[in-house]
Amino acid sequence: MNRFDDIATWLRSSPGRVRVSGSGSRAHTLPKITDATPLHLSQYNRIERLDAGDQTCTVECGVPRAELDAALAEHELELPCLGGGTIGGLFATDPFGPAAAGCPGPRNLLLGMEALLASGSAFKSGARVFKSVAGFDVHKLFVGSTGRLFVATKLHLRLKPRPRTEQWFANRALERDQALQLIHALRQEAQAEEPPPLDKE
Protein backbone atom coordinates (compact mmCIF):
# COMPACT_ATOMS: atom_id res chain seq x y z
CA MET A 1 0.00 0.00 0.00
CA ASN A 2 1.29 3.45 -0.91
CA ARG A 3 2.02 5.64 2.13
CA PHE A 4 -0.06 8.39 0.56
CA ASP A 5 -3.16 6.31 -0.21
CA ASP A 6 -4.76 7.52 3.02
CA ILE A 7 -4.38 11.13 1.88
CA ALA A 8 -5.91 10.30 -1.51
CA THR A 9 -8.86 8.62 0.20
CA TRP A 10 -9.31 11.57 2.55
CA LEU A 11 -9.21 14.07 -0.33
CA ARG A 12 -11.86 12.12 -2.24
CA SER A 13 -14.20 12.20 0.74
CA SER A 14 -13.41 15.67 2.10
CA PRO A 15 -15.79 18.42 1.00
CA GLY A 16 -14.82 22.06 0.75
CA ARG A 17 -11.45 23.74 0.87
CA VAL A 18 -8.24 22.23 2.25
CA ARG A 19 -5.28 24.06 3.84
CA VAL A 20 -2.04 22.10 3.33
CA SER A 21 0.72 22.49 5.93
CA GLY A 22 4.05 20.93 6.83
CA SER A 23 5.93 22.24 9.85
CA GLY A 24 3.83 25.42 9.88
CA SER A 25 6.92 27.66 9.70
CA ARG A 26 5.37 29.90 7.03
CA ALA A 27 1.71 29.77 8.09
CA HIS A 28 1.86 33.42 9.18
CA THR A 29 2.54 34.50 5.58
CA LEU A 30 -0.72 33.01 4.27
CA PRO A 31 -4.17 34.62 4.46
CA LYS A 32 -6.40 33.32 7.23
CA ILE A 33 -9.08 30.88 6.08
CA THR A 34 -11.70 29.83 8.61
CA ASP A 35 -13.63 27.34 6.47
CA ALA A 36 -10.69 25.18 5.30
CA THR A 37 -9.92 21.69 6.61
CA PRO A 38 -6.24 21.31 7.58
CA LEU A 39 -4.09 18.63 5.93
CA HIS A 40 -0.85 18.09 7.88
CA LEU A 41 2.02 16.42 6.00
CA SER A 42 4.91 16.62 8.48
CA GLN A 43 4.69 12.89 9.26
CA TYR A 44 5.74 12.05 5.69
CA ASN A 45 9.41 12.64 6.38
CA ARG A 46 11.48 9.94 4.69
CA ILE A 47 14.56 10.53 2.58
CA GLU A 48 13.76 7.81 0.07
CA ARG A 49 16.84 7.98 -2.15
CA LEU A 50 20.17 9.82 -2.14
CA ASP A 51 22.43 9.19 -5.14
CA ALA A 52 25.73 10.99 -4.51
CA GLY A 53 27.11 9.98 -7.91
CA ASP A 54 24.21 11.48 -9.88
CA GLN A 55 23.81 14.32 -7.37
CA THR A 56 20.07 13.71 -7.05
CA CYS A 57 17.72 12.63 -4.28
CA THR A 58 14.07 11.76 -3.68
CA VAL A 59 12.39 12.95 -0.50
CA GLU A 60 8.89 12.93 0.93
CA CYS A 61 7.21 16.30 1.29
CA GLY A 62 7.51 16.47 5.09
CA VAL A 63 11.29 16.01 5.33
CA PRO A 64 12.72 18.89 7.43
CA ARG A 65 15.28 20.98 5.58
CA ALA A 66 17.75 20.58 8.46
CA GLU A 67 17.60 16.77 8.25
CA LEU A 68 18.16 16.78 4.50
CA ASP A 69 21.09 19.19 4.89
CA ALA A 70 22.69 16.88 7.47
CA ALA A 71 22.28 13.84 5.20
CA LEU A 72 23.71 15.69 2.20
CA ALA A 73 26.68 17.02 4.20
CA GLU A 74 27.89 13.45 4.70
CA HIS A 75 28.37 13.26 0.92
CA GLU A 76 29.73 16.82 0.50
CA LEU A 77 26.51 17.83 -1.28
CA GLU A 78 23.93 20.56 -0.75
CA LEU A 79 20.53 21.78 -1.92
CA PRO A 80 21.58 25.26 -3.13
CA CYS A 81 18.58 27.34 -2.13
CA LEU A 82 17.70 29.27 1.01
CA GLY A 83 14.86 28.56 3.42
CA GLY A 84 13.86 26.20 6.20
CA GLY A 85 10.77 24.26 7.24
CA THR A 86 9.91 21.14 5.26
CA ILE A 87 11.10 20.47 1.73
CA GLY A 88 7.53 20.46 0.42
CA GLY A 89 6.81 23.79 2.06
CA LEU A 90 10.09 25.28 0.88
CA PHE A 91 9.33 24.58 -2.78
CA ALA A 92 5.63 25.40 -2.44
CA THR A 93 6.40 28.90 -1.13
CA ASP A 94 9.80 29.60 -2.76
CA PRO A 95 10.42 32.39 -0.21
CA PHE A 96 13.91 33.46 -1.30
CA GLY A 97 14.62 32.30 -4.86
CA PRO A 98 18.22 31.38 -5.80
CA ALA A 99 20.74 31.20 -2.95
CA ALA A 100 23.19 33.50 -4.77
CA ALA A 101 23.97 35.04 -8.12
CA GLY A 102 24.65 32.26 -10.60
CA CYS A 103 22.93 29.58 -8.51
CA PRO A 104 19.92 27.71 -9.90
CA GLY A 105 16.52 28.70 -8.56
CA PRO A 106 14.15 26.21 -6.92
CA ARG A 107 12.37 25.58 -10.24
CA ASN A 108 15.63 24.34 -11.74
CA LEU A 109 16.35 22.15 -8.70
CA LEU A 110 13.02 20.32 -8.95
CA LEU A 111 13.50 17.45 -11.42
CA GLY A 112 10.11 15.86 -10.87
CA MET A 113 7.49 14.87 -8.33
CA GLU A 114 4.63 12.63 -7.36
CA ALA A 115 1.50 14.52 -6.36
CA LEU A 116 -2.22 14.40 -5.64
CA LEU A 117 -4.96 16.57 -7.09
CA ALA A 118 -7.77 17.90 -4.90
CA SER A 119 -9.92 15.04 -6.22
CA GLY A 120 -7.48 12.50 -4.76
CA SER A 121 -6.16 11.47 -8.19
CA ALA A 122 -2.42 10.75 -8.23
CA PHE A 123 -0.03 11.80 -10.98
CA LYS A 124 3.69 12.00 -11.73
CA SER A 125 5.63 14.70 -13.55
CA GLY A 126 9.27 14.95 -14.55
CA ALA A 127 11.91 12.39 -13.65
CA ARG A 128 14.11 11.17 -10.80
CA VAL A 129 17.33 12.13 -12.57
CA PHE A 130 18.56 15.11 -14.55
CA LYS A 131 17.59 14.51 -18.16
CA SER A 132 15.31 15.86 -20.85
CA VAL A 133 11.66 14.92 -20.41
CA ALA A 134 9.13 15.30 -23.20
CA GLY A 135 5.97 17.27 -22.52
CA PHE A 136 5.02 20.11 -20.20
CA ASP A 137 6.85 20.30 -16.86
CA VAL A 138 3.77 20.34 -14.63
CA HIS A 139 5.92 19.94 -11.52
CA LYS A 140 7.47 23.38 -12.13
CA LEU A 141 4.06 24.93 -11.42
CA PHE A 142 4.32 23.71 -7.83
CA VAL A 143 7.17 26.11 -7.02
CA GLY A 144 5.67 29.21 -5.43
CA SER A 145 2.08 27.95 -5.74
CA THR A 146 1.60 27.67 -1.93
CA GLY A 147 -0.19 24.38 -2.52
CA ARG A 148 -3.12 25.85 -4.47
CA LEU A 149 -2.82 23.48 -7.43
CA PHE A 150 -2.01 20.08 -5.93
CA VAL A 151 -0.34 18.32 -3.01
CA ALA A 152 3.27 17.24 -3.64
CA THR A 153 3.96 13.92 -1.93
CA LYS A 154 7.48 13.15 -3.20
CA LEU A 155 10.02 15.49 -4.75
CA HIS A 156 12.97 14.53 -6.96
CA LEU A 157 15.72 17.09 -6.44
CA ARG A 158 18.90 18.14 -8.16
CA LEU A 159 21.87 18.66 -5.83
CA LYS A 160 25.25 20.41 -6.09
CA PRO A 161 28.66 19.84 -4.50
CA ARG A 162 29.17 21.87 -1.33
CA PRO A 163 31.58 24.80 -1.77
CA ARG A 164 34.92 24.47 0.03
CA THR A 165 34.37 27.85 1.68
CA GLU A 166 31.61 30.43 2.01
CA GLN A 167 31.87 34.16 2.57
CA TRP A 168 28.91 36.36 3.51
CA PHE A 169 28.79 40.11 3.79
CA ALA A 170 26.22 42.87 4.19
CA ASN A 171 26.56 46.62 4.01
CA ARG A 172 23.55 48.89 3.70
CA ALA A 173 25.73 51.89 2.77
CA LEU A 174 26.88 50.39 -0.55
CA GLU A 175 25.45 51.63 -3.82
CA ARG A 176 24.61 49.04 -6.47
CA ASP A 177 27.81 49.56 -8.48
CA GLN A 178 29.92 49.41 -5.32
CA ALA A 179 28.24 46.16 -4.28
CA LEU A 180 28.90 44.61 -7.69
CA GLN A 181 32.55 45.65 -7.51
CA LEU A 182 32.86 44.06 -4.07
CA ILE A 183 31.27 40.80 -5.28
CA HIS A 184 33.67 40.76 -8.26
CA ALA A 185 36.67 41.34 -5.97
CA LEU A 186 35.59 38.57 -3.59
CA ARG A 187 35.20 36.12 -6.47
CA GLN A 188 38.67 36.97 -7.79
CA GLU A 189 40.09 36.49 -4.31
CA ALA A 190 38.41 33.08 -3.99
CA GLN A 191 39.66 31.98 -7.42
CA ALA A 192 43.23 33.05 -6.55
CA GLU A 193 43.36 30.79 -3.50
CA GLU A 194 45.31 27.58 -4.01
CA PRO A 195 43.22 24.43 -3.53
CA PRO A 196 44.33 22.15 -0.68
CA PRO A 197 46.77 19.38 -1.70
CA LEU A 198 45.27 16.00 -2.43
CA ASP A 199 46.03 13.17 -0.02
CA LYS A 200 48.30 10.60 -1.61
CA GLU A 201 47.53 7.01 -0.79
Regions found by a protein language model. Give the residues of each.
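N-terminal glycine-rich flavin-associated loop
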Residues: 1-20, 40-83, 94-128, 163-171
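Residues that form generic nucleotide/phosphate-binding pockets
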Residues: 10, 71, 90, 182-185
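Major-groove DNA-recognition helix of helix-turn-helix-type DNA-binding domains
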Residues: 24
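Short glycine-biased active-site loop of nucleotidyltransferases that positions the nucleotide triphosphate
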Residues: 27-33
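Single-residue recognition of alpha-helix boundary sites
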Residues: 33, 99-100, 158
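Conserved nucleotidyltransferase catalytic core and NTase-mimicking acidic/glycine-rich helix/loop elements
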Residues: 37
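Acidic low-complexity segments
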Residues: 85-89
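C-terminal substrate-binding/cap subdomain adjacent to the FAD-binding core in PCMH-type
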Residues: 92, 110-201
